[in-house]
A protein has these predicted regions:
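Non-catalytic structural scaffold of enzyme domains
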Residues: 1-230
Length: 230
């Protein structure tokens, strides 16, 4: 696996459609240099705005995280909640993808611009984080029992989210996207049964703090980080 994190220019969530598309194409071009079997846009905001452009520019399949998350949400009964960045929510990508599968779906979307920063700072179970989560979640109808975590940072905040809204079933867009990646690799004959391969981590900006945060996300050491220029 070759992972590229655009750490010099995140967060994408408050940027314009045109900027997000440009950033997605630039980072995708670097990854295409490794001749990958599959490209995954492991960011909801970049998936919402840049997926089609990167698919058009790439010879290999390109998968985002919106469609797998929407498929999981559409399979569940009742109203669906979606938490995401401002750019993801404003794109309407989740609403469109869920209603493509379940036309009568009732969807409540909430932009949560503060959550990415709290996750990146490591304030995962801080009282302030819980209060912010509760402020956002209170915007959802009480009838909503299933909520899509429409940003790959948000699962880190599950302890605070669960305390803020007990009894909610959370749909982790990253987890269901990983399952979709495995399924796609099998379908195109590229899924290997061998032992786990190496992980190569590329960043557009690096610091010791970024390594700490990255290892919190992954749950294991990242090893040597490589800095690339766009």
């Amino acid at each position: 696996i070759v992972y590229l994190g655009d750490t010099a220019r995140v967060p994408y969530g408050a940027k314009s459609h045109e900027t997000i598309v440009r950033y997605t194409l630039q980072t995708g071009a670097i990854l295409r240099g490794f001749d990958p079997k599959l490209l995954v846009i492991a960011c909801n905001t970049a998936s919402a705005h840049g997926l089609q452009a990167l698919q058009a520019a790439s010879a290999c399949p390109v998968l985002g995280v919106i469609e797998p998350g929407a498929e999981a949400a559409a399979a569940l009964p009742g109203p669906v909640g979606v938490l995401g960045t401002l750019a993801t929510v404003q794109s309407g990508a989740y609403e469109a993808a869920i209603r493509h599968r379940r036309p009568d779906a009732i969807i409540h979307s909430v932009a949560c611009p503060l959550l990415v920063g709290l996750a990146a700072e490591g304030w995962l179970e801080d009282p302030i984080t819980e209060a912010v989560c509760r402020r956002y979640l209170n915007q959802l109808s009480f009838e909503v029992k299933h909520v899509v975590l429409g940003c790959t940072h948000y699962p880190l905040l599950l302890p605070s989210l669960n305390r803020a809204r007990p009894g909610t079933a959370w749909i982790d867009s990253g987890t269901v996207a990983a399952q979709a990646v495995e399924s796609m690799l099998r379908s195109i004959g590229f899924r290997t049964e061998s032992a786990r391969g190496p992980l190569r981590v590329l960043l557009t900006d690096a610091s010791s703090r970024l390594q700490t945060v990255g290892e919190t996300f992954l749950g294991e050491p990242l090893g040597r980080l490589e800095v690339v220029e766009l």
